[in-house]
């Protein structure tokens, strides 16, 4: 038993890493004793106190202590009962031993560690909380110079890292060998956490260790930790920092011949202007310029497609060449300036460009052909409503869950000490307790209350703060598209010689396409946008009125315990009937005839809230 624990203790530690290339990150194995490993025996009366402690046999332990066993006495391997109870998460035994005089910070084992070190290595948050309540000091170092926060970071115990920092441990604390928690996380933990959590706590990313002067980015490169490299580059880690040998992270990546690391580090250097790139290269590295290109490209493409088709040139060969040139230009722009944010920027650019050219078409081609009072005036009023709702959907707060630094730490401590610091309800990026119905948006990198979805067409999340505006945007957009299609049909009736009743549909299509290719192109755009907007607004209304759920909840209902999911249906605790759902969502009052139930979803953590009975309206 002791040998297994000693092997575990030596698996990772804070000894000076004299030759980093010879040490590889190691996996964390559970070498503690738990119920699943308990052998089936009927009589514990012959067990010694160490074995009884390991397996959590409380009555046997109490019997031996009452018989005179000294709880401070270490075994032959210098391990105390408190150590064994801590590593095996025996909370009741820890309380009992401390009540009988056990020293909470007694050193023991091969690494001369405290029970808190052992609990931290094993990832027992509840035990860490319990020991610290009894006064255990997490800043004490073990025989290898490691404090608890360093152990938690290198073993990937994110919840323990969060708790220790929230309780006052320095996020940049160096162990005896000058390694910070961030360095250990970068070197040993190949996942986003706890690195992401440490970065959220404003850790210093450019500190160097004591022996090699390696920064966290150096250590991530040495470990081939691509996940952490990406996080550190996003956090503006110094890509030109040199270690004691004068090596930068890029030099280390080249030594390891890792193409991915080399490319990303070179791009980061170029983005900072370190390599004196050409003018075109600087433009490519300019994030703001790339964003403008991605937003502007749809304006160019939509115009060129219609403009080339509308040219008074009989030769389709010439037009084909022009389209080929356009395609090459777009290919150049996409390869040079489009990046991972294109999935958000392009849809927004397509929407803005389509509406821009539709309005140009309306005012230039339709203005003199259609009556003002019955057509233009309603169109203009609808446009004002569309612009307002689009602006609110695009720029307003969708329901961002905010908290101060002190509030975040207080939340972490409260959750940990109540046994609920679970990453399913705690966001390690925003460091907040996630309210019910909220979700962290990977695009916006923030937690949104009553999260519905991230909409690239408005460039923002849709949540409790702007969902009603989003529905207004969809409705008025659909009306605008219908007006646009009506305007195209009126234009063809007035300006084009057509014979639909005589020649049929396909001849009619060729007639209107040749009469005004630009108008036909605008009509096709209108039809395309009509289809997705109509489908989206119907889906949204169905979810809001009939199901009482959001898009995120509908897609991930099986992940949430408060939904009852069958093969054909989803039962939502937030569904209070069609009428009630609509009144609450749109906050309809009708001069006081209706009474919606306001809920602050940024601070609602349970499904129990004040929801009055009835149909959702009340006559007064």
Swiss-Prot record:
<dbReference type="GO" id="GO:0030659">
    <property type="term" value="C:cytoplasmic vesicle membrane"/>
</dbReference>
<keyword id="KW-0040">ANK repeat</keyword>
<keyword id="KW-0677">Repeat</keyword>
<keyword id="KW-0449">Lipoprotein</keyword>
<keyword id="KW-0472">Membrane</keyword>
<feature type="repeat" description="ANK 6">
    <location>
        <begin position="245"/>
        <end position="274"/>
    </location>
</feature>
<feature type="topological domain" description="Cytoplasmic">
    <location>
        <begin position="1"/>
        <end position="292"/>
    </location>
</feature>
<dbReference type="GO" id="GO:0042995">
    <property type="term" value="C:cell projection"/>
</dbReference>
<dbReference type="GO" id="GO:0007409">
    <property type="term" value="P:axonogenesis"/>
</dbReference>
<keyword id="KW-0770">Synapse</keyword>
<feature type="domain" description="DHHC">
    <location>
        <begin position="425"/>
        <end position="475"/>
    </location>
</feature>
<feature type="repeat" description="ANK 2">
    <location>
        <begin position="111"/>
        <end position="140"/>
    </location>
</feature>
<dbReference type="GO" id="GO:0140439">
    <property type="term" value="F:protein-cysteine S-stearoyltransferase activity"/>
</dbReference>
<dbReference type="GO" id="GO:0019706">
    <property type="term" value="F:protein-cysteine S-palmitoyltransferase activity"/>
</dbReference>
<keyword id="KW-0333">Golgi apparatus</keyword>
<feature type="transmembrane region" description="Helical">
    <location>
        <begin position="293"/>
        <end position="313"/>
    </location>
</feature>
<keyword id="KW-0012">Acyltransferase</keyword>
<feature type="transmembrane region" description="Helical">
    <location>
        <begin position="505"/>
        <end position="524"/>
    </location>
</feature>
<feature type="transmembrane region" description="Helical">
    <location>
        <begin position="370"/>
        <end position="390"/>
    </location>
</feature>
<feature type="topological domain" description="Cytoplasmic">
    <location>
        <begin position="525"/>
        <end position="620"/>
    </location>
</feature>
<dbReference type="InterPro" id="IPR002110">
    <property type="entry name" value="Ankyrin_rpt"/>
</dbReference>
<keyword id="KW-0812">Transmembrane</keyword>
<dbReference type="GO" id="GO:0019705">
    <property type="term" value="F:protein-cysteine S-myristoyltransferase activity"/>
</dbReference>
<dbReference type="GO" id="GO:0046959">
    <property type="term" value="P:habituation"/>
</dbReference>
<dbReference type="GO" id="GO:0042734">
    <property type="term" value="C:presynaptic membrane"/>
</dbReference>
<feature type="topological domain" description="Cytoplasmic">
    <location>
        <begin position="391"/>
        <end position="469"/>
    </location>
</feature>
<comment type="function">
    <text>Palmitoyltransferase that catalyzes the addition of palmitate onto various protein substrates and is involved in a variety of cellular processes. Has no stringent fatty acid selectivity and in addition to palmitate can also transfer onto target proteins myristate from tetradecanoyl-CoA and stearate from octadecanoyl-CoA. Plays a role in axonogenesis.</text>
</comment>
<dbReference type="GO" id="GO:0051386">
    <property type="term" value="P:regulation of neurotrophin TRK receptor signaling pathway"/>
</dbReference>
<dbReference type="GO" id="GO:0070372">
    <property type="term" value="P:regulation of ERK1 and ERK2 cascade"/>
</dbReference>
<dbReference type="Pfam" id="PF01529">
    <property type="entry name" value="DHHC"/>
</dbReference>
<protein>
    <recommendedName>
        <fullName>Palmitoyltransferase ZDHHC17</fullName>
        <ecNumber>2.3.1.225</ecNumber>
        <ecNumber>2.3.1.-</ecNumber>
    </recommendedName>
</protein>
<dbReference type="InterPro" id="IPR001594">
    <property type="entry name" value="Palmitoyltrfase_DHHC"/>
</dbReference>
<keyword id="KW-1003">Cell membrane</keyword>
<feature type="topological domain" description="Lumenal">
    <location>
        <begin position="367"/>
        <end position="369"/>
    </location>
</feature>
<feature type="transmembrane region" description="Helical">
    <location>
        <begin position="470"/>
        <end position="490"/>
    </location>
</feature>
<dbReference type="GO" id="GO:0000139">
    <property type="term" value="C:Golgi membrane"/>
</dbReference>
<keyword id="KW-1133">Transmembrane helix</keyword>
<feature type="repeat" description="ANK 4">
    <location>
        <begin position="177"/>
        <end position="207"/>
    </location>
</feature>
<dbReference type="InterPro" id="IPR036770">
    <property type="entry name" value="Ankyrin_rpt-contain_sf"/>
</dbReference>
<feature type="transmembrane region" description="Helical">
    <location>
        <begin position="346"/>
        <end position="366"/>
    </location>
</feature>
<keyword id="KW-0966">Cell projection</keyword>
<keyword id="KW-0808">Transferase</keyword>
